Amino acid sequence: MATKLSIIVFSIVVLHLLLSAHMHFLINVCAECETKSAIPPLLECGPRCGDRCSNTQYKKPCLFFCNKCCNKCLCVPPGTYGNKQVCPCYNNWKTKSGGPKCP
């Protein structure tokens, strides 16, 4: 009986330590998220996508997909072309055929 009780107590202590470590990790990740300047509030998607799509001849589709990507990824790369490494989600979101989803 004592071994069952000690196993239960040990399991609870280990679970508590794991939860504490996980919460500490989440707090650190959230602190890093707040310091990134590439993440715009949702209201900034329009102007940032306007800048991103300013040099294309296909403005409507560019703005549509840029806003869609911005709303999902909360990030728009700077400039009118390239720089996608700044926003990994924006860069890694692909179409069914494997092409880039975001302009």
From Swiss-Prot:
This protein's UniProt keywords: Disulfide bond, Gibberellin signaling pathway, Secreted, Signal
Pfam families given in the database record: GASA
Record note on modification: Six disulfide bonds may be present.
Claim: Secreted is one of the keywords in the record: yes
GO CC annotation terms, alphabetical: extracellular region
InterPro entries: GASA
Signal peptide range in chain numbering: 1-20
UniProt-listed GO biological process terms: gibberellic acid mediated signaling pathway
Compartments reported by the entry: Secreted
The keyword Signal is annotated on this UniProt entry: yes
Family that this chain belongs to: Belongs to the GASA family.
Protein's job: Gibberellin-regulated protein that may function in hormonal controlled steps of development such as seed germination, flowering and seed maturation.
Protein name: Gibberellin-regulated protein 13
Organism: Arabidopsis thaliana
Gene: GASA13
